């Protein structure tokens, strides 16, 4: 094996070095403290699980992104987590089994067999929050507001948000009686805004339903889109109108809370269609070709764990958040250089200093005070009689 092969990392797999690793850890603590202040409880999920458990309730996209291995003890197939959200849903539905609303949050590394987008990391640090047990738009507004508060905490500039609702397309597709194959083809065409394909795929449908499905292609833009949707989808089935009402209610409350936030609506944007069941949302910033935070409602996932529960939430990549954020993350600087000594009084003083939050670095045999600079120390412990004093490091 060539020497280069011993240190070469796979594409999309990164190591994080100081001081960036410290900045990420400080940001992680700040965001989790924010979540806690909103009532969200922290949970930790396993890095690897049996595959059928890991992928329960998830779409095919997650299956393709999951690294798979064979457990040498059981012989069963296992997977490294590619998304923490289904694991947290299982905790709520199967482990906690609470009756009322439950708020959970998490932060941890995930591993992707395939990158989410070109040049994306395959080892992001996924961070997010989930709210279970309430199906009202108020829950969606809460998690979106928390997501935006997180971005404000990180001081990510120039954010704008996309909002949609998969229930609008799903309700129209069911009313049209589309087969699974045609529904998937129409879904793909809508994502590409391929109007000619949409027209062809809806040619044999009742004219009113065909017209409403075709309208989804260009029902995108600012707040006026929702007013236009009320007119163009006026004859839609009740579930479609209910979905539109929910989207309107969410949009109005967000506009009141965040009047400076640009909102963009796309009723043909079906991000996570096979996974989400209601409102879907994503945050974008200029110069980044993919969303930096995203989420939505996924009420069906708990049923796969034996207990259906309404659910809504969001996630982001902590490393991306730190990279894009302009908030000043203050890292501890400086430290105290401790000589290599067996003096008991020195040890007692060092323990006291560390308990007070001071950073104390011990010299190793043969190291001189000059090594203290390399260890980012600006002070040193010097013995005066029986006592040790903290003094500035000599130039």
From Swiss-Prot:
User: A GO BP term, please?
Assistant: L-histidine biosynthetic process
A Pfam family annotated for this UniProt entry: tRNA-synt_His
HAMAP family noted in UniProt: HisZ
Species, as recorded:
Pseudomonas syringae pv. tomato (strain ATCC BAA-871 / DC3000)
Known partners and oligomeric status:
Heteromultimer composed of HisG and HisZ subunits.
Example of a GO cellular component annotation carried by this entry = cytoplasm
Underlying gene: hisZ
What's this protein's family per the entry? Belongs to the class-II aminoacyl-tRNA synthetase family. HisZ subfamily.
Biological pathway: Amino-acid biosynthesis; L-histidine biosynthesis; L-histidine from 5-phospho-alpha-D-ribose 1-diphosphate: step 1/9
User: What is its subcellular localisation?
Assistant: Cytoplasm
Spell out the protein name for this chain: ATP phosphoribosyltransferase regulatory subunit
Other notes:
This function is generally fulfilled by the C-terminal part of HisG, which is missing in some bacteria such as this one.
Q: Which InterPro entries match?
A: aa-tRNA-synth_II/BPL/LPL (IPR045864), HisRS-like_core (IPR041715), HisRS/HisZ (IPR004516), HisZ (IPR004517)
């Amino acid at each position: 094996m060539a020497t280069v092969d011993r240190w070469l990392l796979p594409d999309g797999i990164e190591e994080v070095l100081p001081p960036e690793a410290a900045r990420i850890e400080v940001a992680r603590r700040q965001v989790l403290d924010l979540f806690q202040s909103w009532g969200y409880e922290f949970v930790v999920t396993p890095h690897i699980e049996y595959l059928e458990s890991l992928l329960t309730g998830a779409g095919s996209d997650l299956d393709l992104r999951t690294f798979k291995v064979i457990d040498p003890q059981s012989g069963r197939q296992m997977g490294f987590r590619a998304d923490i959200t289904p694991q947290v849903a299982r905790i709520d539905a199967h482990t906690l089994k609470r009756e009322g609303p439950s708020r959970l949050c998490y932060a941890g590394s995930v591993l992707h067999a395939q990158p989410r987008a070109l040049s994306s990391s395959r080892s992001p640090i996924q961070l997010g929050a989930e709210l279970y047990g309430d199906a009202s738009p108020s829950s969606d507004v809460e998690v979106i507001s928390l997501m935006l508060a997180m971005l404000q905490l990180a001081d990510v500039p120039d954010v704008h948000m996309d909002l949609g609702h998969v229930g609008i397309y799903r309700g129209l597709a069911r009313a049209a009686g589309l087969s699974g194959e045609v529904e998937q083809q129409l879904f793909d065409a809508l994502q590409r805004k391929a109007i000619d394909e949409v027209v062809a795929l809806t040619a044999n449908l009742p004219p009113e339903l065909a017209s409403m499905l075709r309208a989804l292609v260009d029902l995108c833009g600012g707040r006026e889109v929702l007013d236009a949707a009320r007119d163009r989808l006026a004859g839609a089935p009740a579930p479609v109108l209910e979905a539109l009402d929910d989207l309107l209610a969410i949009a109005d409350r967000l506009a009141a809370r965040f009047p400076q936030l640009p909102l963009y609506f796309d009723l043909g944007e079906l991000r996570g269609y096979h996974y989400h069941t209601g409102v879907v949302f994503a945050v974008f910033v200029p110069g980044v070709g993919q969303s930096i935070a995203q989420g939505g409602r996924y009420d069906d996932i708990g049923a796969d764990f034996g207990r259906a529960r309404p659910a809504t939430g969001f996630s982001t990549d902590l490393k991306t958040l730190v990279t894009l954020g302009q908030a000043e993350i203050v890292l501890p600087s400086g430290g105290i250089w401790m000589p290599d000594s067996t003096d008991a009084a020195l040890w007692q003083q060092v323990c006291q200093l560390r308990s007070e939050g001071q950073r104390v670095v011990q010299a190793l045999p043969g190291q001189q005070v000059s090594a203290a600079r390399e260890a980012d120390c600006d002070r040193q412990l010097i013995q005066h009689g029986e006592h040790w004093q903290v003094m500035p490091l000599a130039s």
